Each structure stands twice: as structure tokens, then as C-alpha cells.
């Protein structure tokens, strides 16, 4: 595979690799990649799949899913969620929580991910959309969970 940096062509042999923690423009103040540019770059690097894991939301999932399929890439749907002790408690010590990446591995996982993100906004919002371990226990089926970052 070759990539171009300006007029310089660089040949690289890259093993199969898939990004599983990607923020788009829907992760305000943290993601700059537009979905079309993400698809273009993934194809340039010879990737066969790519994930979307925006902060606390799934606003770009439909656009991402359609764009990935159109580009011949496997879309992996996910979200970076904030986990606190009690998502209903409005306490300054419970604002940020730990960060987790949740990826849907099947349709049941997608439905559970949508439920978790919805609850984070409708029941758990306090500065940020939040869930707790009890919700995660209830809606874990079909999900892959990973630490997200240094905040995880």
C-alpha cells in the first residue's frame, strides 16, 4: 500500500488493523473527523472495518453506517459512555465518571446500546449523559466493553 504526504509517496506494509475508538465531529471539542473523510482515510489505509465511538451520543450512527457500507467498509457501531455509581444522582462528585467504550457485536447489542445511551440522556444527564453499572448489567447482552482512555 502507498500513502502520499504532499508529493512524497511512502510504501508501507500494514497488517490488518481496525480502529475501535474513533470520535467524529459529533464528539464536540474532541473529534474533528467528518464521516466522509474518515471513510476516505480508512480506505486509503486498506482497512476493512472502522468503528464510531462518539462521546455520550450516537448522533452520527445512521450517516456513518450508510457511508461505511457505501465505501465497502464494515461499520462497527459504538459509543464512549460515562459510568458513575448512580446515574440518577445529581452530585458534583458524580459528574464525569469513568469512560468506557461499548461496541455492538450484533443487533441485540445495538438495541441495548441505544437503550443505554437513551437512558444516559433521559435519566442520567448531569453535565454529561451518564449510566451506572446497574444499567450496564441490565443491558449488556450483545455488547463488547473496553476501557476508553486514561479516563477509563
Language-model segments: which ranges?
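Phosphodiester-processing cores and adjacent nucleic acid-binding clamps
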Residues: 3-152
Amino acid at each position: 500500500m502507498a500513502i502520499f504526504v504532499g508529493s512524497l509517496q511512502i510504501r508501507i506494509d500494514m497488517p490488518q488493523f481496525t480502529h475501535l475508538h474513533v470520535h467524529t465531529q459529533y464528539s464536540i471539542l474532541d473529534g474533528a473527523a467528518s464521516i466522509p473523510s474518515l471513510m476516505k482515510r480508512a480506505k486509503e489505509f486498506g482497512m476493512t472495518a472502522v468503528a464510531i465511538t462518539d462521546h455520550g451520543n450516537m448522533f452520527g450512527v445512521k450517516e456513518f453506517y450508510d457511508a461505511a457500507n457505501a465505501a465497502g467498509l464494515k461499520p462497527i457501531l459504538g459509543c464512549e459512555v460515562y459510568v458513575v455509581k448512580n446515574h440518577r444522582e445529581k452530585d458534583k462528585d458524580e459528574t464525569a465518571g469513568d469512560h468506557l467504550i461499548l461496541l455492538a457485536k450484533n443487533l441485540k447489542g445495538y438495541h441495548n446500546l441505544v437503550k443505554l445511551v437513551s437512558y444516559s440522556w433521559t435519566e442520567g444527564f448531569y453535565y454529561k449523559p451518564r449510566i451506572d453499572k446497574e444499567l450496564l448489567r441490565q443491558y449488556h447482552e450483545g455488547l463488547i466493553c473496553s476501557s476508553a482512555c486514561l479516563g477509563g
